[in-house]
């Protein structure tokens, strides 16, 4: 059983008399107006901050606009390649093109634009999900990793399996589930019983149910799959139809109970942004094999007691 802990170190305030810091040096622009230098000249230093929150200055916005890809309008990031006339296109779009989208010149041979790469190292780029609410601007080396986990990226359908390709905003997830996955039932209350029927069905099977409490919807998922060859296992987990930050406010408890036996798991629910695949891969959920399932099952039906609670601040 794994119980998450919300305790952490307390912040302390400095006390006593402190020395006054020396006056700051005269203000210098954060970006050079021009780039010059002969052979062997080094690139301008990268900004010390890897990310900032909030709008960029007008000058900075004009500079980042020079890196816009004319095809997808995302930013052209290092390694930066140009056409024979000097026009830029991002690496993702370049792989699909045979000629420059701006001047129709050939994109081969590949010509590296080292000057723009040096400028890119001194610029912070807005997250690609800025239009949906993200206010972060990041160094180009940090941008892809952030965008993979950005809270403002589109939500995928949280149902197990890859058959549904729907994507949309968090506000539209429940509407999608209601209209496109009508077989999913919803129970209300903090304590419910998740009944999985016919657990002896062969092959990979999943069971899904919704639980509504604390003004939120939680998705209960039970999957049976052969994670290791010849060894079928069950994986049970709870997802919040919400953000990671919202999920941290709750805890869930899964319990198998019967025949004077008890098996429990307690954890923080995952956001549907994270999905169930990573949790199953890392066994970060309630895991039991078919032999244990049969100890708690009744005529091929398995009841899992599910309790949702709020975490103390």
Curated annotation (Swiss-Prot):
Residues the record lists as binding Zn(2+) 2: 157, 164, 176, 181
Enzyme category, top tier: transferase
Residue numbers binding Zn(2+) 1: 127, 134, 146, 150
Alphabetic keyword roster: Biological rhythms, Cytoplasm, Metal-binding, Transferase, Ubl conjugation pathway, Zinc, Zinc-finger
Chain intervals for the UniProt region annotation (Disordered): 1-49
InterPro entries in UniProt: 7-in-absentia-prot_TRAF-dom, SINA-like_animal, Sina-like_RING, TRAF-like, Znf_RING, Znf_RING/FYVE/PHD, Znf_SIAH
UniProt family annotation: Belongs to the SINA (Seven in absentia) family.
Quaternary state and interactors: Homodimer.
Protein name: E3 ubiquitin-protein ligase siah2
Gene: siah2
């Amino acid at each position: 059983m794994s119980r998450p802990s919300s305790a952490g170190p307390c912040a302390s305030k400095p006390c006593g008399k402190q020395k006054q810091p020396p006056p700051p040096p005269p203000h210098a622009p954060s970006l050079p107006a021009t780039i010059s230098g002969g052979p062997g000249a080094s690139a301008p230093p990268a900004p010390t901050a890897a990310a900032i929150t909030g709008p960029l200055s007008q000058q900075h916005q004009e500079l980042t606009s020079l890196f816009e890809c004319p095809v997808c309008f995302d930013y052209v990031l290092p390694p930066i390649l140009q056409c024979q006339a000097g026009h830029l296109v991002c690496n993702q779009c370049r792989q699909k093109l045979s000629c420059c989208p701006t001047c129709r010149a050939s994109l081969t041979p590949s010509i590296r634009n080292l000057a723009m790469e040096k400028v890119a190292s001194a610029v912070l780029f807005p997250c690609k999900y800025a239009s949906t609410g993200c206010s972060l601007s990041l160094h180009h080396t940090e941008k892809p990793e952030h965008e993979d986990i950005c809270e403002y990226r589109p939500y995928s359908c949280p149902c197990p399996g890859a058959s549904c390709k729907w994507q949309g905003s968090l506000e539209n997830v429940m509407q999608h589930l209601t209209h496109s996955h009508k077989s999913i039932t919803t129970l209300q209350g903090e304590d419910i019983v998740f009944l999985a029927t016919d657990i002896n069905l062969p092959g990979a099977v999943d069971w899904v149910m919704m639980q509504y409490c604390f003004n939120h919807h939680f998705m209960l998922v039970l999957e049976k799959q052969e994670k290791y060859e010849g060894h079928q296992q069950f994986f049970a987990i709870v997802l919040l139809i919400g953000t990671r930050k919202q999920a941290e406010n709750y805890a869930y408890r899964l319990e198998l109970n019967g025949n004077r036996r008890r098996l429990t798991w307690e954890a923080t629910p995952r956001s549907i942004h994270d999905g169930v695949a990573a949790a199953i891969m890392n066994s970060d959920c309630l895991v039991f094999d078919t032999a244990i399932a049969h100890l708690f099952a009744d005529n091929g039906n398995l009841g899992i007691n599910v309790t949702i609670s709020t975490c103390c601040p």
